[in-house]
Amino acid sequence: MYCLQWLLPVLLIPKPLNPALWFSHSMFMGFYLLNFLLERKPCTICALVFLAALFLICYSCWGNCFLYHCSDSPLPESAHDPGVVGT
């Protein structure tokens, strides 16, 4: 389970508040995960645990999924603040 310590922090990286950056963020995270899986070749158990955690986070639609934004979940309150989005 040593290889899992490099995968689990990826789930904790927050999505940007600016909706214009969501595509760039999801592409970066997808390429990072693909590169990690091809280069480090984690064990099967670690890969399955990570994919199960990623599936549960994205399926529950809590807003932490970096693959897509759920249409029924609202934007964060700070996303409407021009001072935050403009940074």
UniProtKB/Swiss-Prot annotation:
Source species, domain of life: Eukaryota
GO biological process, one term: apoptotic process
GO cellular component, one term: membrane
Keywords for this protein: Apoptosis, Cell cycle, Cytoplasm, Membrane, Nucleus, Transmembrane, Transmembrane helix, Tumor suppressor
Transmembrane residue ranges: 19-39, 43-63
Pfam families hit by this protein: BC10 (PF06726)
Subcellular location: Cytoplasm; Nucleus; Membrane
Membrane topology value: Multi-pass membrane protein
PANTHER family for the chain: BLADDER CANCER 10 KD PROTEIN HOMOLOG, BLADDER CANCER-ASSOCIATED PROTEIN
Assembly and oligomerization: Interacts with RB1 (phosphorylated and unphosphorylated). Interacts with STAT3; the interaction is promoted by cell stimulation with IL6 and phosphorylation of STAT3.
Cited function: Acts as a tumor suppressor; induces growth arrest at G(1)/S checkpoint and apoptosis via RB1-dependent and p53/TP53- and NF-kappa-B-independent mechanisms. Modulates expression of genes involved in the regulation of proliferation, cell cycle and apoptosis.
Family: Belongs to the BLCAP family.
Name the UniProt record assigns to this protein: Apoptosis inducing factor BLCAP
Native species: Macaca fascicularis (Crab-eating macaque)
Gene: BLCAP
